[in-house]
Curated annotation (Swiss-Prot):
It comes from Australian bat lyssavirus (isolate Human/AUS/1998) (ABLV). This is Glycoprotein. The chain crosses the membrane at residues 460-480. Glycans are attached at residue 338. The lineage of its organism: Viruses, Riboviria, Orthornavirae, Negarnaviricota, Haploviricotina. It comes from the Viruses. It is a single-pass type I membrane protein. Attaches the virus to host cellular receptor, inducing endocytosis of the virion. In the endosome, the acidic pH induces conformational changes in the glycoprotein trimer, which trigger fusion between virus and cell membrane. There is convincing in vitro evidence that the muscular form of the nicotinic acetylcholine receptor (nAChR), the neuronal cell adhesion molecule (NCAM), and the p75 neurotrophin receptor (p75NTR) bind glycoprotein and thereby facilitate rabies virus entry into cells.
Amino acid sequence: MLLQIVLLMSLMVFSPCPGKFPLYTIPDKLGPWSPIDIHHLSCPNNLIVEDEGCTSLSGFSYMELKVGFITTIKVSGFTCTGVVTESETYTNFFGYVTTTFKRKHFRPTPEFCRNAYNWKVAGDPRYEESLHNPYPDYHWLRTVTTTKESLLIISPSVVDMDPYDKSLHSKMFPKGTCSGASVPSIFCSTNHDYTLWMPENPKPGMSCDIFTTSKGKKASKGGKVCGFVDERGLYKSLKGACKLKLCGISGLRLMDGSWVSIQNHEEAKWCSPDQLVNIHDFHSDEIEHLIVEELVRKREECLDALESIMTTKSVSFRRLSHLRKLVPGFGKAYTIVNKTLMEADAHYKSVRTWNEIIPSKGCLKVRERCHPPYNGVFFNGIILSPDGHVLIPEMQSSLLQQHVELLESSVIPLIHPLADPSTVFKRDDEAEDFIEVHLPDVQKQVSGIDLGLSEWERYLIIGASAVVLFALAIIFAVCCRRCKRRKKARTDRIELDRKVSVTSQSGKVIPSWESYKIEAGGHFRS
């Protein structure tokens, strides 16, 4: 039963629930019945779906998803950020130097970013040198500005690739998607205008390493491929398959959601956007191995039952259940009528739930109606119990249920649009380990004489200086005037002294009028 599982997926075309593995198989075409001898009994080949007579097997190689392939394709790259480091030095009147560093950003070019990354990988010494701040120069009473442009390379920076169209997805991209071409042949813009993302490998096609080559056998009829036996021995039909490209490689998406690189199936149409590919992990591979083992075990049980029938020359309903075909396709159905072994050609379809074939008590639904029992016997070991319930020998196994749940849970898209930021840096100092820089020439700019004052302080001092100079000018003018007055007064006094000096009668010089009066009076009295 578990076996039917994978094989039917291909034949799910006949199932109301395409893409699901069956719980059971029941004929949708049956009859007519004819008596046979026990020597005509045979065990069906459940490993090969013999539908449409495609029984010719030939070896071939095909590609499928790698085992252990996760839901996303990780593409390693690096971010390139343009950084401008600016140093300002000012030397005051006394020779004291003040240095200030500032950082700005600029948008780099992809060519320079690629060169910078190559320098980092090659260990170019310019990488180390360009990380240093520009060497500050200085001039007395001047401000010297020195700028240095660098390209900061940080790697690894991992993004996700969608294998359906090879587009890139990450939180760092605007709207979560690379704004460039679908193939990251050049660069991707980021949420920061001054940062670009580029793939480490300039040939991004190499990043799509998700396939592995397997060997199997093609089942065909007249050159038409009906299906194939995969590397694990499980048959998969191409019925219901659709064409789908993964990472630019053409192939087929089968009904079970798996993908193979079979390209000569002309009847297949292109898949719709909602038809995604299932992941291929170790668990699904393990289940496939178990299914193949179960199919082999069921065939051995069938052969044991057939041997018992031949040995004992007797047939029971329970033994007939081993002869049922476990996968969809053409086969045989057996029953016992009036102690006579009967056989009929049948085409089996998959059954997902028991309600599909037992809609009500006592009803076994075959060909859209309740199949009539004969003396409480249907076919393939199915009987009607005394209380009127339909009894089927096979019961759902835990392995089958496990596989059904596995397939249902793994139908997820390969795209994973959001990258985990924690995958970029694993430790705090990792960014410093992956820095690489493109170093243009250092630029220097020397200002005029500068007192190191702000603009308002400069105007304030200029105004105060003007007032002081004006006051000094006034004081100087006043002082000059006073000096002139003193000099003139001294000159006038000398001239006056010269004018009032007279000669007395005795012939002596009299210096003043008063002296003259005194001297004259004395002479007069005598």
